[in-house]
Amino acid sequence: MTEVKLDFQKQGGLIPAIILDHTSKEVIMLAYLNEEAYQLTRTSGQMWYWSRSRQELWHKGATSGHYQTVKKITADCDQDTLLIEVDQLGAACHTGSKSCFFHIIWDEEDSKTD
């Protein structure tokens, strides 16, 4: 395991985190962590985020029961973005969807002509 120095200052004290379902490898969320949320995530084994809209720490699942248990945390080459694999209990999205990414804007079928 490699110890990295995450760069929280590059983006105003926050690091974006791409959240993957550990089993399916599907992207289920994009959220942000500040240093405190990162430390809470590391020590608790559950996901903690920084809510940009509410300006407060957010323990994923504390209200909904849809907890995320951390399986793996990887930093990108610049050490300013995280890729986090989780076991998702219930829906990841506040809409009740498994993933927050369900609005298909374009796919290869859109570019095919008859």
Curated annotation (Swiss-Prot):
SUPFAM superfamilies with a match to the protein in the record: HisI-like
Name of one Pfam family that matches: PRA-CH
GO biological process, one term: L-histidine biosynthetic process
Entry EC no(s): 3.5.4.19
Subcellular location(s) per record: Cytoplasm
Cofactor(s) demanded: Mg(2+); Zn(2+)
Recorded GO MF terms: magnesium ion binding; phosphoribosyl-AMP cyclohydrolase activity; zinc ion binding
UniProt remark on cofactor binding: Binds 1 Mg(2+) ion per subunit.
One GO cellular component, as annotated: cytoplasm
Reactions catalysed according to its record: 1-(5-phospho-beta-D-ribosyl)-5'-AMP + H2O = 1-(5-phospho-beta-D-ribosyl)-5-[(5-phospho-beta-D-ribosylamino)methylideneamino]imidazole-4-carboxamide
Keywords: Amino-acid biosynthesis, Cytoplasm, Histidine biosynthesis, Hydrolase, Magnesium, Metal-binding, Zinc
Positions annotated to bind Mg(2+): D76, D78, D80
Pathway(s) of this molecule: Amino-acid biosynthesis; L-histidine biosynthesis; L-histidine from 5-phospho-alpha-D-ribose 1-diphosphate: step 3/9
Binding site for Zn(2+): C77, C93, C100
SUBUNIT field: Homodimer.
Functional description taken from the UniProt entry: Catalyzes the hydrolysis of the adenine ring of phosphoribosyl-AMP.
Recorded family membership: Belongs to the PRA-CH family.
Family annotation (PANTHER family): HISTIDINE BIOSYNTHESIS BIFUNCTIONAL PROTEIN (PTHR42945), HISTIDINE BIOSYNTHESIS BIFUNCTIONAL PROTEIN HIS7 (PTHR42945:SF1)
Designated name of the protein: Phosphoribosyl-AMP cyclohydrolase
Gene name in the database record: hisI
